[in-house]
From Swiss-Prot:
It comes from Rickettsia bellii (strain OSU 85-389). CDD domains: UDP_invert_4-6DH_SDR_e. The lineage of its organism: Bacteria, Pseudomonadati, Pseudomonadota, Alphaproteobacteria, Rickettsiales. This is UDP-glucose 4-epimerase. Belongs to the polysaccharide synthase family. It catalyses: UDP-alpha-D-glucose = UDP-alpha-D-galactose.
Length: 341
């Protein structure tokens, strides 16, 4: 799949970048790859990754997706791009929405444009459930990032570069997520702070996130959006599961929802479900390839609009306490934290 190819990962020192590199190294995929380029802003994280991985095929590029020239330079002779660079903290983006716009929208446009100009074969854009029916700045910026990618796909149907989107639910134990917060609170003998006990979130592992991107890479066509079917849990059950795993007696304290938070998340809208293809573990949402010449569609007729329920963390499979414990105990992060407890 990647034999003698050059890959670029934007935001490559983040959770996804570390996870996909771990997969490539563990499965010995990297021996067939020509080069993997890690593009990010943080030189310290790059240095840490360089020392930890110590692999000559992994190259590091300091730059910011907000700066077109830096991403264009890194894109030279690249075959495939995984675009993971983003601002993803919901409350932070609420206070600094222009920063979300600059990174998640304008930065994404720079990546997509550079990929087109440099004739990259395929670009996988990493999005989020918060882009569906968005109510916060982060979700809105990611929704527009998706629109940029699909618009590029629509305009590049006959060109070389293929653009696909993947949407994540909550990636467990990723940087800035709630699981590391709860574990730190347990270890420091503090109250576990829960925003709203009945709030539900999809539960994906970092392994799942890599599987989703690689599936989209292998099977995605121009303008496809891919979503992995995922179970969900309430935040309270998640906290209690970690209490049980770490044998903790810490109290749970409810603090109320934060800026921009939703009670539940949607991975596929009802409008998208009407045209989605069920692929077993995944949904594929094909691009609407029509152009602006609507007159011909009135002549041809339109497909009947199907009314389907959106796919949400409220109507997906809901895990009970023991099931959440089992899921958490399979995470490398939780296993490491247990060893160090």
């Amino acid at each position: 799949m990647f034999v003698d190819k050059t890959l670029l990962i934007t935001g490559g020192t983040g959770s996804f970048g570390n996870a996909v590199l771990s997969r490539f190294l563990k499965n010995d995929i990297i021996k067939d790859i020509k080069e993997i380029r890690i593009f990010s802003r943080d030189e310290k994280k790059q240095e840490d990754m360089r020392i930890a991985l110590n692999n000559p095929k992994i190259k590091f590029y300091i730059g910011d997706v907000r700066n077109y020239n830096s991403i264009d330079d890194a894109m030279k002779d690249v075959d495939y791009v995984f675009h993971a660079a983003a601002l993803k903290q919901v409350p932070t983006c609420e206070f600094y929405p222009m920063e979300a716009i600059n990174t998640n929208i304008l930065g994404a446009e720079n990546v997509l444009r550079a990929a087109t100009i440099n004739k990259v074969a395929k670009v996988i854009v990493l999005s989020t459930d918060k882009a569906v029916y968005p109510i916060n700045a982060m979700g809105l910026s990611k929704a527009l990032m998706e629109k940029l990618a699909i618009a590029k796909a629509r305009m590049n149907v006959r060109d070389k570069t293929v653009f696909c989107v993947t949407r994540y639910g909550n990636v467990m134990a990723s940087r800035g997520s709630v699981i590391p917060l709860f574990i730190n609170q347990i270890k420091q003998n503090k109250d576990l702070t829960i925003t709203e006990p009945s709030m539900t979130r999809f539960l994906m592992s970092l392994v799942d996130s890599v599987d989703l991107v690689l599936y989209a890479f292998e099977y995605g066509h121009q303008g496809d959006i891919f979503v992995q079917k995922s179970p969900a849990s309430t935040i309270e059950v998640l906290a209690k599961a970690l209490q049980g795993i770490f044998n903790s007696k810490n109290k749970i304290r409810f603090i109320g929802t934060r800026h921009g938070e939703k009670h539940y998340e949607s991975l596929v809208s009802s409008e998208e479900m009407a045209k989605a293809e069920d692929l077993g573990n995944y949904y594929r949402i094909p691009m609407d390839g029509r152009d602006l010449n609507y007159a011909k569609y009135f002549v041809e007729g339109e497909k009947k609009i199907a009314l389907l329920e959106d796919y949400t963390s409220h109507n997906t499979k809901r895990l009970n306490l023991e099931e959440v414990k089992e899921l958490l105990l399979n995470l490398d992060y939780v296993q490491e934290e247990l060893k160090n407890a």
